[in-house]
Amino acid sequence: MQAFAFASAVSLALAAAPAESAPLRVASLNLCTDELALLLASPGQIASVSHLSHKPADAAWWRSARALPANDGSLLSVVPLRPDLVLTMGGGGGDKAGIARRLGLRVLDLPYPQHLDDIEQGLRAVSAALGRPQAGGALIARIAALRRGQPKRMVDTVWLGGGGRSVASTGLTADWMALAGLRQRPLRGDRIGLEELLTRPPSLLLRSDYRAGQFSTEQNWLRHPLARGARSRVLATDGRRWTCMGPSLIAEITRLRRLIS
């Protein structure tokens, strides 16, 4: 059922224009489709990426992205570039497809992934649309290898962001963590307080460094003496890669698995 829903969403998106040969000018409107395009497209195939990918604070791939023109995330912003394929995610459904038809654009609108299977299906869809199925297959094979080699011993872990924010114990983030041998602890409201951090410290704190240098109340929480005194092993992780939870996490999960084993 999940695979059918994913395929249906992709099919509706591609209905904006007839299928053609491999596109030569691809525009991506979304940070998460930027990631897929940069990983899967051939040199010179990308015409534009979203403005967020130009920002080092938001995108781990900003260096590659800055070699390309940025757009503001709207269909209208890429019309002057005359793309033959537009990539986006979770945006507008039928309305966006209708606008695309009026503008003469072919749009691939992916649903937001909920599980690892969705990541693999997204890779298949985008690599096929780009005319580069082998590139998608290579990344899918790497995810499959991680899944086959998932550690049997799981470490009690809390993924920790600013202000005590954490993540759900089920779903895509937890799925990726499990591939590294980390079991996300269930938390009320997906947050951990200083009291629990001190009285029931997890074996491991997976601390996101997303905007770690930014002055804010949430970041100050992580610097609180009580937070710093928690009796847990702490590993830092590149929080930017967890925003989309896409295939750029493959290398991060491999790194974490090596550190934990």
Task: List the predicted regions and their residue ranges.
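Bacterial Sec-exported substrate-binding components of ABC uptake systems
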Residues: 2-36, 71-73, 80, 129-158, ...
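Extracytoplasmic substrate-binding proteins
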Residues: 22-25, 85, 95-165, 186-188, ...
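Short, structured coil segments at secondary-structure junctions
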Residues: 42, 63, 102-105, 180, ...
